[in-house]
């Protein structure tokens, strides 16, 4: 059976830390969607590991790790991240696999991603993309013109010629769309010719891999990337990523039936952050937001961009919970709220004098809602590293209880500091 870790807000909730904790007791860690546009840091002892595309399960020497067919793979970044982990002492090569059905991200995807963003910026419609080529790759995938891993590593004698044909067809289509932008197609093609043999040992049929693991009753953890509010269907479209980041993406990205899922863990920051553009109802463009940003060290691992900060939004969380069906929650970075005398929580939206019954799909509505807040007392004491739930200050426990009661989902873990060990189990 599979347990799943999913981001419940707009990403950067601290999923990697929970995955790291759970990885101590699992045998397979899988990524189902996204690419190297994700980013999180895991600290083991005094060593810090930055992950973008590769599964966090690599920190566990006994855990196998796989990128599923829903993931899009930029091969140079794949090997760069792998080498960086190996330099820090992780033995990864015999424990890391890539789906033969995963689509490839090329440099021209990244180049056109930035060109597209520049176009949108001129019209003041910027999405705030990471520029990693994720959107253009999913676009070519959806248009059935993309190139998959098996196209690159196939042993068929005509495979390389077919790969080149597919590649030039894609490049030509980008030139037609964006003009003769600066890009060396020949040089990239030569690099991929070398990658053919280097990548081959990592490539597997991911559907067969996952179903064999299930049949063998292995303990499996699926590591979600990004978060529900960035989902292509259910997020704040168009300010979203280009893949299914919710529970649906787990099934389609790994070829799993719903019956394979046992637990769905929603990871929730004790306040709310967002990177890039898009509506953010509880955002605090004031001293509160700056304080959260400063204490929480809210800077993106992948982009280095400052994260926008605001109060916890339980309207977002109610919506996220309904879609993903969390069986329990991990509240992270509770310690960031230690110095607040009062803490606000968004509990409903009002639009033109009427309370909304659900999270609105229309961004023109979302941009103009008034957030209805409940104000709770802070605890104003340092909780860093507390190991027992009962040792938390009374007001901290009340804050967590309020979240549980509102969402009707139990909290199982609470993050009380940045260290790997700073996570208590309720």
Swiss-Prot record:
Family from the record: Belongs to the adenylosuccinate synthetase family.
Organism: Meyerozyma guilliermondii (strain ATCC 6260 / CBS 566 / DSM 6381 / JCM 1539 / NBRC 10279 / NRRL Y-324) (Yeast)
Positions that bind IMP: 12-15, 37-40, 130, 144, 226, 241, 305
UniProt subcellular location: Cytoplasm
Cysteine disulfide partners in this protein: none
Biological or metabolic pathway of the protein: Purine metabolism; AMP biosynthesis via de novo pathway; AMP from IMP: step 1/2
InterPro entries, per the entry: Adenylosuccin_syn_GTP-bd (IPR018220), Adenylosuccin_syn_Lys_AS (IPR033128), Adenylosuccinate_synth_dom1 (IPR042109), Adenylosuccinate_synth_dom2 (IPR042110), Adenylosuccinate_synth_dom3 (IPR042111), Adenylosuccinate_synthetase (IPR001114), P-loop_NTPase (IPR027417)
Record GO biological process: 'de novo' AMP biosynthetic process; IMP metabolic process
One GO MF term: adenylosuccinate synthase activity
Protein name as it appears in the record: Adenylosuccinate synthetase
Catalytic reactions of this protein: IMP + L-aspartate + GTP = N(6)-(1,2-dicarboxyethyl)-AMP + GDP + phosphate + 2 H(+)
GO CC terms of this entry: cytoplasm
SUPFAM superfamilies, per the entry: P-loop containing nucleoside triphosphate hydrolases
Required cofactor names: Mg(2+)
Active site: 12, 40
Keyword set, alphabetical order: Cytoplasm, GTP-binding, Ligase, Magnesium, Metal-binding, Nucleotide-binding, Purine biosynthesis
Enzyme class: ligase
A Pfam match: Adenylsucc_synt
Binding positions for substrate per the UniProt entry: 301-307
Binding site for Mg(2+): 12, 39
Stretches that traverse the bilayer: none
EC number of this enzyme: 6.3.4.4
UniProt: GTP binding residues: 11-17, 39-41, 307, 333-335, 415-417
Chief place of localization: cytoplasm
Function: Plays an important role in the de novo pathway and in the salvage pathway of purine nucleotide biosynthesis. Catalyzes the first committed step in the biosynthesis of AMP from IMP.
């Amino acid at each position: 059976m599979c347990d799943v870790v999913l981001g419940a807000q707009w990403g950067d909730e601290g999923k990697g830390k929970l995955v790291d904790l759970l990885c101590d007791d699992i045998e397979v860690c899988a990524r189902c969607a996204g690419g190297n546009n994700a980013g999180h840091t895991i600290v083991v002892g005094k060593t810090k590991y930055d992950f973008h595309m590769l599964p966090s399960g690599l920190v566990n020497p006994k855990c196998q790790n796989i990128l599923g067919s829903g993931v899009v793979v930029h091969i140079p970044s794949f090997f760069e991240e792998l080498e960086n982990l190996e330099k820090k002492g992780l033995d990864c090569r015999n424990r890391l696999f890539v789906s033969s059905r995963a689509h490839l991200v090329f440099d021209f995807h990244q180049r056109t991603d930035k060109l597209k963003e520049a176009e949108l910026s001129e019209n003041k419609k910027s999405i705030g993309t990471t520029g990693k080529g994720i959107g253009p790759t999913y676009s070519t995938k959806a248009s059935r013109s993309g190139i998959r891993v098996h196209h690159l590593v196939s042993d068929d004698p005509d495979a390389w010629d077919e790969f080149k044909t597919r590649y030039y067809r894609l490049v030509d289509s980008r030139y037609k769309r964006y003009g003769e932008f600066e890009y060396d197609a020949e040089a990239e093609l030569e690099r991929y010719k070398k990658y053919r043999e280097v990548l081959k040992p990592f490539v597997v049929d991911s559907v067969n891999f996952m179903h064999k693991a299930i049949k063998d009753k292995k303990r499996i953890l699926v590591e979600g990337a990004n978060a529900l509010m960035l989902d292509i269907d259910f997020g704040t479209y168009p300010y979203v990523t280009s893949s299914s980041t919710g529970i649906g993406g787990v099934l389609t990205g790994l070829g799993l039936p719903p019956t394979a899922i046992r637990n769905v863990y929603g990871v929730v920051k004790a306040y709310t952050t967002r990177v890039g553009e898009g509506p953010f109802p509880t955002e605090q463009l004031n001293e509160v937001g700056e304080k959260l940003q400063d204490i929480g060290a809210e800077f993106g691992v992948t982009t280095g961009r400052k994260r926008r900060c605001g109060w916890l939004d339980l309207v977002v969380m109610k919506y996220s919970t309904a879609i993903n069906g969390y069986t329990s929650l991990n509240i992270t970075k509770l310690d960031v709220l230690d110095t607040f005398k009062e803490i606000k929580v968004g509990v409903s939206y009002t639009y033109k004098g009427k309370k909304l019954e659900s999270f609105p799909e229309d961004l023109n509505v979302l941009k103009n809602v008034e957030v209805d807040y409940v104000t709770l007392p802070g605890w104003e004491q340092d909780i860093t590293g507390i190991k027992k739930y009962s040792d938390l200050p009374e007001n901290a426990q009340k804050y967590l209880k309020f979240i549980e009661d509102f969402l009707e989902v139990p909290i199982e873990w609470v993050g009380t500091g940045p260290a790997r060990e700073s996570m208590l189990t309720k």
